[in-house]
Amino acid sequence: MLLFPVTAQRRVRPLKLRAIYDGEALMTTKSAPYHAHIYYESQDRVTAEHLHQELSNAQGVGHFVSVLFVGEMRDKKVGPHPKPQFEVHFHEDALPRVLTLIKASGLAALVHPLTDDDLADHTSLSVWIGEPLPLDHSVLDPPGMNQGIARFGKSDV
């Protein structure tokens, strides 16, 4: 069951991933790729560091086996993100636990599936935890050219 709505006006074509283990094409509900962008201000950096460490330590273990990557803490604006943030890559089956940790931290976050439509991912398909922030949509990839796909689970740049 996907937790993010697809708008009635527009359908987003599901992304086909290559399985990490056996090379077969893969796109199931439990393996659907997600990103969380977790934002912080300088006064919240210690809280962000604790959450970053907690996610890093849990990565690949137990209920967090589907958390594949915890990115660097970026202390400045990067891409469409207007303030410091770090990124977490995970499969949908980790979504409830990742959301619980983020909510408990009190930090704002943008959580979205990863499809071939970067704009939809960051707008109509996303969910905000905390106060939404204005994103710079002009730097997002055009539909069908999402660069986030190639770096999923590997890199945040």
What feature does the model see in each segment?
Residues 20-157:
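Long, contiguous binding/interaction regions
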Residues 1-26:
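N-terminal amphipathic/basic-hydrophobic helices that include classical n-h-c signal peptides
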